[in-house]
Each structure stands twice: as structure tokens, then as C-alpha cells.
């Protein structure tokens, strides 16, 4: 039981770090097109939905971010951030 709580805490910490990266480096970056910032906000909302298990929240966010990851209007630095976030989300089980 204690191990389970520690694992959940680590997963929640990882999710919070991912939310922080999305918020600071995508949502608040005015050089990023509005549709991409909106998708990042939707991914953040999906990650913050405590009614679902962490793996389901991560899968929801992955689906949203993968859809916009190939947008030709996305700045290269933002695309790199999105790919890094996707990699981190894929590790959440």
C-alpha cells in the first residue's frame, strides 16, 4: 500500500511537471499559433482531470498533442517541446 502511494505521488509529480512545461513554453508563448496553444490548453485540462486514472489522462493528452504535432505552422522549438512532452507522457502507466 505504501509503495502504491509513493508511485502515485511520483506519477502526479511528473504530470505536474509536464503541465508546467506546456503552460510555460507553449501556452504562454505568443509566437506559437493560437490553435496550437489551444490544443496545449486542452491537453493540460485532460491531465488535470482527477476523475480519471493517470494513464488515461496521459493517453487523452497524447491524442490531443499528436494531432497537432505535425502542424506545418508550428515553430520548430515548439515541435521539439511537444515531442519531449509526448515522450514523457508515454512513460506514464
UniProtKB/Swiss-Prot annotation:
Classification via InterPro entries: Ta0600-like_sf, UPF0147
Source organism superkingdom: Archaea
Recorded coiled-coil stretches: none
Pfam families linked: UPF0147
Family membership noted in the UniProt record: Belongs to the UPF0147 family.
Listed name of the protein: UPF0147 protein PF0239
Annotated source species: Pyrococcus furiosus (strain ATCC 43587 / DSM 3638 / JCM 8422 / Vc1)
Amino acid at each position: 500500500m505504501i509503495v502504491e502511494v509513493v508511485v502515485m505521488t511520483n506519477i502526479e509529480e511528473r504530470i505536474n511537471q509536464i503541465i508546467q512545461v506546456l503552460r510555460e513554453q507553449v501556452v504562454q508563448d505568443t509566437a506559437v499559433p493560437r490553435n496550437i496553444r489551444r490544443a496545449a490548453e486542452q491537453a493540460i485540462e485532460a491531465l488535470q482531470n482527477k476523475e480519471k486514472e493517470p494513464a488515461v489522462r496521459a493517453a487523452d493528452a497524447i491524442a490531443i498533442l499528436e494531432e497537432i504535432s505535425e502542424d506545418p505552422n508550428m515553430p520548430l522549438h515548439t515541435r521539439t517541446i511537444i515531442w519531449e512532452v509526448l515522450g514523457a507522457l508515454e512513460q506514464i502507466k
